[in-house]
Structures are given as structure tokens and as C-alpha cells.
From Swiss-Prot:
Keyword check for Cell cycle: no
GO cellular component terms, semicolon-separated: extracellular region
Signal peptide annotation: 1-20
CDD domains, sorted: TIL
GO molecular function, a single term: serine-type endopeptidase inhibitor activity
Disulphide bond pairs: 42-74, 51-69, 54-65, 58-93, 76-90
Keywords, ordered alphabetically: Disulfide bond, Protease inhibitor, Secreted, Serine protease inhibitor, Signal
Keyword Signal: yes
Protein name, UniProt field: Serine protease inhibitor 1 protein
Residues covered by the TIL domain: 42-93
Originating species: Caenorhabditis elegans
Subcellular location: Secreted
Regions that span the bilayer: none
Principal cellular location given in the protein's record: secreted
Length: 100
């Protein structure tokens, strides 16, 4: 039973990552918030996500992330090799940590 749960979790994570990589990322760097209608740029290497999700950190094993649309925000695009560093910056990581 434990193995079935692990296999199911890995399968769902892989499907989620494939779908995110193919249709969720928008590489625009200027954002317009609905509340204020003011234009704000994303930080270096970040992209604006209308439907954001969990982010990965350099040097840490990726954790399962529920497929729930979180509030719009600038996000670090993991599908391009970018992760958050210890200071919260979006940087390209040369990790040897395996992806789930």
C-alpha cells in the first residue's frame, strides 16, 4: 500500500510538472495588478504568473506541490533551471539534487 501511494504521488508530480512546463509560464516581465492598475516589473530572471504555484530552492530537493492556483505574482521559472537562493533571489542553479 505504501509503495502504491509513493508511485501515485510521483506520477501526479510528474504530470503536474509536464503541464506546468508546457502551458503555464509567461515570460513577460511587466505586471499590471488588478487592485491598483499600476505597472510593476518582476525581478531579475522572474516571470509573471497569473496562476502561481510553489517555487523551488537551490540545493534543496523539490517538494510535492498541490495543483492549486495561488495568487498572481512574479515567480522563478524552475522549468528553465532557475530557483530561489537563500536571500530570495531568482538565480540559475547548478544543483545535483534530483527532480521528483
Amino acid at each position: 500500500m505504501k509503495h502504491l501511494l509513493i508511485v501515485s504521488l510521483v506520477f501526479v508530480t510528474i504530470i503536474w510538472k509536464i503541464e506546468c512546463e508546457t502551458d503555464m509560464y509567461d515570460d513577460s516581465s511587466i505586471v499590471k495588478t488588478e487592485e491598483t492598475e499600476e505597472v510593476k516589473p518582476c525581478g531579475l530572471n522572474e516571470v509573471w504568473m497569473v496562476c502561481s504555484s510553489c517555487e523551488e530552492e537551490c540545493g534543496k530537493t523539490p517538494q510535492p506541490c498541490p495543483r492549486i492556483c495561488q495568487p498572481a505574482r512574479c515567480q522563478c521559472p524552475a522549468h528553465k533551471g532557475y530557483r530561489r537562493d537563500g536571500q530570495g533571489n531568482c538565480i540559475f542553479c547548478h544543483d545535483s539534487v534530483p527532480k521528483l
